Amino acid sequence: LINKLVEHLNSGNFANTFSNIKSENEIIDSFNLLTAKPMLYIANVDEDEILSNDYNLFSKKLQAYANQKDSLYLKICASIEQEISNFEKEEEKQFFLNEYKLSEPGLDKIIKYGFDLLGLQTFFTCGEKEVRSWTIPKNALAPEAAGRIHSDFQRGFIKADVFHYNDIIKYQSEKRLSELGLIRQEGKEYIVKDGDVL
């Protein structure tokens, strides 16, 4: 297996394209090879390319290469990202994004793509004084999410009140969410969703 893998790598191929056999992939994963990891290719392009939504020769080549390697590709403009980071007010930031016909900052996309590649998602906890985000694997059950906060919570988990981040942003009050029936109790078999508040 190792000789075949070395030959595969010496031919310019990545370790993540070596085998579709689960037992072989488990062995390869134990080597922690960089090319066995999921990859995201990011092209830093100029403002004109972002405005025109066109691709220059180099970004086209990088996109083709990423596609060939079955990887994700994203283009951003670092100078635009720098300007976005300087805005303090959300309205100013949104106006600037609209000028460039961008739905969201490139940094937000990088984070989303990264989480997706790594099979991760975020849930939140909130209290009167603090809101905190926690990272868990996708499809994690509620007790596993509770365990990220504290191991005792995982062992003693029975149920949790759950609502979604978008709902609390929209209605600004847990009391209002409760009145609207948007807070529910979930048990041990609940699969936590990205953006849940527990």
Task: Give the label of every model feature segment.
Residues 1-191, 198:
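C-terminal-of-GTPase-core extension/linker across diverse P-loop GTPases
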